[in-house]
Amino acid sequence: MILLSLYLCLAAMLHQSEGEASPKLPGLMTSNPDQQTEITDKHNNLRRIVEPTASNMLKMTWSNKIAQNAQRSANQCTLEHTSKEERTIDGVECGENLFFSSAPYTWSYAIQNWFDERKYFRFNYGPTAQNVMIGHYTQVVWYRSYELGCAIAYCPDQPTYKYYQVCQYCPGGNIRSRKYTPYSIGPPCGDCPDACDNGLCTNPCKQNDVYNNCPDLKKQVGCGHPIMKDCMATCKCLTEIK
């Protein structure tokens, strides 16, 4: 039997069906601690081997809250991305990768497929060919995404792709202003020498900036200005990765 797989940034609209249990799913359900470990370790191992090397790549950790949100997305069986509002968790907009298949695949396989888009990606340039996808790769290696949660659903009413795997990443990557520079080039942990775990930084800034120009605003008006209430990362995180 030919196994079909599809991993898209923008999926074609298909008939909706409610996600339900499948006899083949229990081993892949992310309520299982071993699956959480596999998913998190796979992401971190791939983040360690980016080329060129990253000086500010954060280590990812598992979030049950994000996983629950990803499960809600998977259970819809729409085979398309959720809205920005549906991916906003505790005020933080998160990213999302999708993997559709006609038979169940391991999480490591799905994540590796996302990462393998790197063959079409050139740092600070973008896609190296037309009509190729790179957004899954850049999200997997987005330096500031440090929490993730994933989920799988079985969608029996879908004609082809009945297995639907979703990972969500917070904060989300693929920011338009730097989507082709998903991290800073430099020696591993170059930006976090005192908070490093085998090439990955362990000191994420847990504050967020609303504006892209917060560093410039800080220089102009200082953190005491009322407008800077929307620049908490710039003002509060002095040594953390932000």
Swiss-Prot record:
GO terms for cellular component: extracellular region. SUPFAM superfamilies: Crisp domain-like, PR-1-like. Expressed by the venom gland. InterPro entries: Allrgn_V5/Tpx1_CS (IPR018244), CAP_dom (IPR014044), CAP_sf (IPR035940), Crisp-like_dom (IPR042076), CRISP-related (IPR001283), Cysteine_rich_secretory (IPR013871), SCP_CRISP (IPR034117), ShKT_dom (IPR003582). PROSITE patterns: CRISP_1 (PS01009), SHKT (PS51670). Residues 41-169 form the SCP domain. Pfam families: CAP (PF00188), Crisp (PF08562). The keyword Disulfide bond applies. One of its GO terms (molecular function) is potassium channel regulator activity. Its main location: secreted. It comes from the Eukaryota. Residues 205-237 form the ShKT domain. Keywords: Calcium channel impairing toxin, Disulfide bond, Ion channel impairing toxin, Neurotoxin, Potassium channel impairing toxin, Ryanodine-sensitive calcium-release channel impairing toxin, Secreted, Signal, Toxin, Voltage-gated calcium channel impairing toxin, Voltage-gated potassium channel impairing toxin. Residues 1-19 form the signal peptide. It is found in: Secreted. Disulfide bonds join 77-155, 94-170, 150-167, 189-196, 192-201, 205-237, 214-231, 223-235. IC(50)=0.52 uM on IA-type current, and 0.86 uM on delayed rectifier current. Alters a variety of ion channel activities, including voltage-gated potassium channels (Kv), voltage-gated calcium channels (L-, N-, and P-type) (Cav) and ryanodine receptors (RyR). Is toxic to mice (causes lethargy, partial paralysis of rear limbs and lowering of body temperature). Belongs to the CRISP family. This is Cysteine-rich venom protein helothermine. The lineage of its organism: Eukaryota, Metazoa, Chordata, Craniata, Vertebrata.
